[in-house]
Amino acid sequence: MEVKAFLCQHKAENYENCEDRFCVNIDTKSVAVADGMSQSFLPEYWADLICRRFSESTDGWYPTHERVQELEPSWNKLRDKYADLEEKKNNPYSYLIRNSIAEKKSAACTFVGIRFLSSKKLKYHILGDSSMIIFREGKLKSEEDIFSTHRGKFDSFPDFFDSNHLRGGKGDPVNDEIQISDKDTILLVTDPFSDFFYEKAKSGNDCSEYLQEVKRLNSHDDYVKLVEKWRNEGMHDDDSTLVVIIPNDKDTISIAYEDKDPSEDIFIDKTSQIKSKFEEEQPKGKSSHQRENDNTDREIIDCSEFQNFIDEAINKHGTEEHGWFGWLKILFNSFVKLKKFKGSERKRIKKMIRKYLNNKQ
């Protein structure tokens, strides 16, 4: 099997701040991808731990909500080490990290991992909207060849593994075996690709042309250009991971290309991310009283469709596990994606969501 693995960050971020992770291990014939959920706390560390534990396992270990509890102490150590380093650097926003630790905020990630049992068979393990996509003889023959615990439901509320055993995560992982052939191509992807290919397959597109574009990738620059192209075609803007696996008649795995793992710089300066969240929660130049009484903005809810969208999401999924800022981000991203707002309209929608959530508290 030949493997190529690529990462690309959200358009507004730096590569080092990407919260997706992948691992390819040629000895255990294992490949894993995890999507750190950005509304959680330091999710990239959690995604990295689960990917590494799975791919390096020689005893067939795979994640379940119970088994990932063994990784919780490791995540706690990484979290505390990061907090210590930020304080030593006199980061003015380091208190936000300590506050998050005191509030027992945790990390969450989706996961897809495969382990080759032979050149003709693999075992897969999936939780959330990260997916395994199988092209049979160069074609995506139906939505059924996109394997995810959501099976076509790619929204902003995926199943996940949680770093806090008291929360326990969400959803039931899928674990199964499947036959493959040397005429197949396997993709392990995070949700932007899951959603993109699902919509194409649902409309009857066999995606053969898209697969050819994928097979031509040989560098990070090639991949970034492809992601930008597909975003212009409707793929949503988020951290995007793509691992391409081409089976053959060999029982070994060779890595033809892989992007640098951001985990190599696991204690990079995240000041910009922390500051960004702080500024979104506390807009400059206005006190909370002024924001509540600001009549220069449009009405809090100016269409019943928007109000129904938020109410339905809250009634269906609850809010406790996400927290205030998490819900701001989830709802904003979901509604913007739904309505394809841009520019100043995006800022207005974010204000509307903030005000509406404040009124519901």
Residues covered by each model-derived region:
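Short glycine- and acidic-rich boundary segments immediately preceding or forming the N-terminal edge
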Residues: M1-C18, E86-N99, D145-H150
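N-terminal entry segment of metal-dependent catalytic domains or homologous docking segments
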Residues: M1-D59, S130, L166, N175-E177, ...
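Acidic loop->beta-strand submotif enriched in PP2C/PPM serine/threonine phosphatases
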Residues: Y15-N25, E103-S119, K123, F147-Y198
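Short hydrophobic beta-strand that contains or immediately precedes a catalytic carboxylate
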Residues: V31-D35, H125-L127, L187-V189
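Helix-loop-helix
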Residues: R52-N90, A201, N205-R231
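Catalytic core of PPM/PP2C metal-dependent serine/threonine phosphatase domains
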Residues: T64-F135, G169-I180, G234
